[in-house]
From Swiss-Prot:
Interacts with ZNF202. GO terms for biological process: positive regulation of DNA-templated transcription. SUPFAM superfamilies: Retrovirus capsid dimerization domain-like (SSF47353). This is SCAN domain-containing protein 1. It comes from Homo sapiens (Human). GO terms for cellular component: nucleus. Its main location: nucleus. Residues 52-80 have a biased composition (Low complexity). It is found in: Nucleus. The lineage of its organism: Eukaryota, Metazoa, Chordata, Craniata, Vertebrata.
């Protein structure tokens, strides 16, 4: 470590020390002494699993010294917060009056009212529509059959005459129409 002290004094940063100047770096023919004083080499860290990206390159495993110098280069303070798209921000907004959660009708309206001009290009529009559809249809908790039922009911309400639509809305919503 004596060889690195002038470099540390000149640069003020251990990150500027070349790796070959660090203790234990480079090729040495003598094994390092562990804390007990024997001349046996220290136990190496466990080998990475073959499926990991570092499996073929054992040198890619950071040493504690390299990790410490990398930590000194990290910026101090909070990381910049990215602005979430409007649809995601609205979905995370506080619940409405009386602590009610946003229902499927709210998410359906957001999906149906989305316009291409709200997005920055076709890929972003696709991504936002996909997210809005997931919030509305909830494929994580609903079956395909339930999702189809929701879509058919919505389309039926859209094509029914006004009088029939008013009667349909007053009826029970748990009655299935497709089977």
């Amino acid at each position: 470590m004596a060889a690195t002290e002038p470099i540390l004094a000149a640069t003020g940063s251990p990150a500027a020390v070349p790796p070959e100047k660090l203790e234990g770096a480079g090729s040495s023919s003598a094994p390092e002494r562990n804390c007990v004083g024997s001349s046996l080499p220290e136990a190496s860290p466990p080998a990475p699993e073959p499926s990991s990206p570092n499996a073929a390159v054992p040198e890619a495993i950071p040493t504690p010294r390299a990790a410490a110098s990398a930590a000194l280069e990290l910026p101090l303070g909070p990381a910049p917060v990215s602005v979430a798209p409007q649809a995601e921000a609205e979905a995370r907004s506080t619940p409405g009056p009386a602590g009610s959660r946003l229902g499927p009708e709210t998410f359906r309206q957001r999906f149906r009212q989305f316009r291409y001009q709200d997005a920055a290009g076709p890929r972003e529009a696709f991504r936002q529509l996909r997210e809005l559809s997931r919030q509305w249809l909830r494929p994580d908790i609903r079956t395909k059959e339930q999702i189809v039922e929701m879509l058919v009911q919505e389309q039926l309400l859209a094509i029914l005459p006004e009088a029939a639509r008013a009667r349909r809305i007053r009826r029970r919503t748990d009655v299935r129409i497709t089977g």
